[in-house]
Amino acid sequence: LRVASRLREWSLGSFFRYSTETDYESRSVGLSLARELRQKTITLGANYAYTHDRAFRILANVPGVRIPWKSKVPSEDDPTDFVDGPTNVLQVHNASLGYNHVLTRTLLASLQVEGSHARGPQENPYRRVRNGMEEVHPLLRRRLAVSGSARYAIPKARLALEPRYRFSADDWGVRTHAPQLRLHARVLPELSLRARYRYYIQNAAEFWSPTGDYAATDRYRTAD
């Protein structure tokens, strides 16, 4: 469900989304606000979304039965004994600020800053590490991303070039770089083609093991 409204230079929007799978339920709500400035050559925007998910695990030998997946935390009595966490709810807050600027008749530039705060189970309940133990990820993840793009039109050639770049970092120690190049071509008045190349690279999380093996006392484990 999506609602949008416009009043002069202001634009306001909101949405609600519900989705469900056999072992997952998700509800999301969001708001967006934008304003145009300087004869519509500049647009400032802000967005916020909240997601409330519930994770479950299907029991392999009991058809139709699922149990809440609450991740795992070390027992207070024995750090090698992992017990269920406090909840199967994953709450995610996403917020972003955007800036678009028409610099010339043929050049548009954009800049966006995004932040997210996720709390709750975030691993795959069915996946195990190499030595057979369940995945265990931190219950909290905070991420910040910065992205920029430009779109340059070549009217005589009916082409537009669109370079993009995105960088993100989180408190798991993951850093990502994603440069991208898009080419838009108007072949016919009613036909346009687009070619895209994207390169993506990231480092591993701080708790990742290059061998895939973990000790029983390791607080976090991942099979990625």
For each feature predicted by the language model, list its residue ranges.
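Outer-membrane beta-barrel translocator/channel fold
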Residues: 1, 43-107, 115, 194-224
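Residues on the lipid-exposed face of transmembrane beta-strands in outer-membrane beta-barrel proteins
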Residues: 3-5, 31-35, 97-101, 146-152, ...
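Residues that define the transmembrane beta-barrel architecture of outer-membrane proteins
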Residues: 6, 25-29, 89-95, 138-146, ...
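Transmembrane beta-strands of outer-membrane beta-barrel pores
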Residues: 7-9, 16-22, 35-37, 50-54, ...
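Outer-membrane beta-barrel channels and translocator barrels
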Residues: 7-10, 38-40, 104-106, 155-157, ...
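Transmembrane beta-strands of outer-membrane beta-barrel proteins
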Residues: 12-14, 42-46, 109-111, 159-163, ...
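Extracellular loop and loop/strand-boundary signature of outer-membrane beta-barrel proteins
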Residues: 15-19, 30-34, 79-85, 94-96, ...
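Outer membrane beta-barrel transmembrane domains
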Residues: 116, 121-151, 169-180, 184, ...
